Amino acid sequence: MTKHLLVTNDFPPKIGGIQSYLWELWRRLPPEDVTVLTTPHVDADLFDRDQGFRIERTREPVLLPTPVLARRVRHLAAEVGAEAVVLDPAVPLGLIGAGLRLPYAVLLHGSEVTIPGRLPGTRSLLARVLAQASLLIAAGGYPEAEARRVTDALPPIVQIPPGVDTARFTPLAPIERASTRARLGLPATGPLVLSISRLVPRKGMDTLIEAGARLSTSGRHPQLTVAIAGQGRDRARLDRLINKTGAPARLLGRIPSPDLPALYACADVFALSCRSRWGGLEQEGFGIVFLEAAAAGIPSVAGDSGGSAEAVIDGETGLVLKDPSDPTALAEAIGQLLSDPARASRQGQAARHRAETDFSYDVLAHHLGNAIERLGVPATS
């Protein structure tokens, strides 16, 4: 494969969807062909020693598209014999691409394309980065579509969506669910609706709390528990909303990574009513959490925002809400699955099958490696 550098601000041990996406893909590439340039982080030394590939960390806490960074990338590329560079994301780091004197690719996620692509002051910068790149790596159809809104002068595009570790996230046998819930501090019986995300407005946790209140007072699901895992600036507001509505919701805070597979697998439904905000500037990039729920055999209810409808197939692996801000519609969708266990089971099994066949990181990394290999092939006239 083409020897290359990955240059990014977002790499483990930092926690987040993009960080996980990059690590899961790049750790599956031939280690002798990979060097990562990224930022410092607590416990980075321990993490870096466990990787099969080289990781270089800057002293600066944030990588910015400066001449200093461009020189650092050129020198490191020469040192390791890299033939190409992958820049993440397109803006701002993609701005150094044209000056590297090497073929370069840029990664396209969600808001990292949408926001600069729709603001007059940055649209032309993004268009230039995209047009001058040798390859675009899009994390799904949504960021590719956003790139095509910016300019028609695009290089080849390959879609490499987020994946999931289907060996780590697996279904639980029914006999294990009660004991697993008890171990995690959750009610052993009764319907369990799970959501995992940063607690920020566009994730729609307020809508989920209001939907939970409607479901519990309807008389159909009196033992319902809505478990919300994650941290974020919306925590205090959500606490107040739970108290106001009397919703059977619990804010679990940050869940240790080793406990996540079991938490998904002991739920009945996964729900994330993500929504678009600010005229479409804020949207869901893809939603790795939907894939983790799918691998655990759990159907999802998703808000139709950005790439979420790619992660959940409406009516097959879960339900997609056209109006994610409507708590009545969300309550109805969740209620459909809770009231029809056979349907929920079918959709959960279909979700698991799709996770194994379409979102295996081994398969996705193979496609990524083939795309990067083409970066090192000189263009023919």
Regions found by a protein language model. Give the residues of each.
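A short helix/loop element that forms part of the nucleotide-sugar donor recognition site in Leloir-type
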Residues: 170-186
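Acidic donor-binding loop of glycosyltransferase active sites
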Residues: 254, 265-283, 298
